[in-house]
From Swiss-Prot:
EC annotation from Swiss-Prot or TrEMBL: 2.7.2.8
Compartments where located: Cytoplasm
UniProt-listed Pfam families: AA_kinase (PF00696)
Segment forming the signal sequence: none
Gene3D superfamilies: Acetylglutamate kinase-like
InterPro entries associated with the record: AceGlu_kinase-like_sf, AcgluKinase_fam, ArgB, Asp/Glu/Uridylate_kinase
Family statement drawn from the similarity comment of this UniProt entry: Belongs to the acetylglutamate kinase family. ArgB subfamily.
Example of a GO biological process term: arginine biosynthetic process via ornithine
Site-annotated residues for Transition state stabilizer: K7, K212
Functional note: Catalyzes the ATP-dependent phosphorylation of N-acetyl-L-glutamate.
Listed name of the protein: Acetylglutamate kinase
Length: 254
């Protein structure tokens, strides 16, 4: 089976181009199995604000106490994931919404106590995911369940998507509200792994792009063949990436 992991950023979900679903249907008709992983940061922040809870981040990761976890779980599973599945189904693309608890899809462990209920994935139930792919488009949110303490945890959606891609040795398309990796305000078409640290040291890659490219580097070193970072707001973006039409930035081991 040939898989493509497609990570849709929370900032893109409300402005996702409708052609994305048609592109995914086309992939499936060619026996390529897309797996969707999504975040939901803006929706979580709005839900927290409605409860007068101030979001708190350390090193770019959301600190998740018990109250924040409860709201995050409800937002990602009941609101964002359900809406995305409905959108796919309305376009005659049968989808199924999943979190880590469903079919014991992925195992997690606690990341670091200072972050509270933040987890990292440690194992993927490939058999379950492969079976589901034959029937539906899996749409996976970033809520995991820790079998050891019986608690739900929030996972960074990029981290989860890269982990799934590495585990399946599949390419990953990271769709967000940015067009790719910018160097001197220009999107570079390719970013070899050997150049990443140099660009970071020189300040050419900075801010939120640093963890994205470092996670991409780690994914490629662990089995993912390539990572493409591109805008999710462009028409037929998935088809363009699949056809190597030089959109966004391709990160690869060369």
């Amino acid at each position: 089976m040939k898989f493509i992991v497609i990570k849709i950023g929370g900032s893109t979900l409300s402005d996702m181009h409708p052609s994305i679903i048609n592109n995914i249907k086309h992939l499936r008709s060619n026996n390529i199995y897309p797996i969707i992983v999504h975040g939901g940061g803006p929706f979580i922040n709005e839900a927290l604000s409605n409860q007068q809870i101030e979001p708190h981040f350390v090193n770019g990761l959301r600190v998740t106490d018990k109250a924040t976890m409860t709201i995050t779980k409800h937002t990602l599973i009941a609101d964002v994931n359900t809406a995305l599945v409905a959108q796919f189904n309305q376009h005659q693309c049968s989808a199924i919404g999943l979190c880590g608890l469903d079919a014991q899809l992925f195992e997690i462990t606690s990341f670091d106590q200072q972050y509270g209920y933040v987890g990292v994935p440690t194992a993927l139930n490939k058999d379950a995911l492969q079976y589901l792919c034959t029937k539906f488009v899996p749409i996976i949110n970033s809520i995991g369940f820790n079998n050891h303490d019986g608690e739900f945890y929030n996972i960074n959606a990029d981290t989860l998507a890269y982990f799934i891609a590495s585990s399946l040795k599949a390419p990953i398309y990271v769709l967000s509200n940015i067009a790719g990796v910018l160097i001197n305000d220009v999107v570079i078409p390719q970013l070899p792994l050997v150049d990443i640290h140099q660009y970071i040291e020189h300040g050419d890659i900075y801010g939120g792009m640093i963890p994205k490219v470092l996670d991409a580097k780690n994914a490629i070193e662990n089995g993912c063949p390539k990572v493409i970072i591109a805008s999710g707001n462009k028409p037929n973006i998935i088809e363009s990436i699949y056809n190597n039409d030089f959109v966004g930035t391709t990160i690869l081991n060369s």
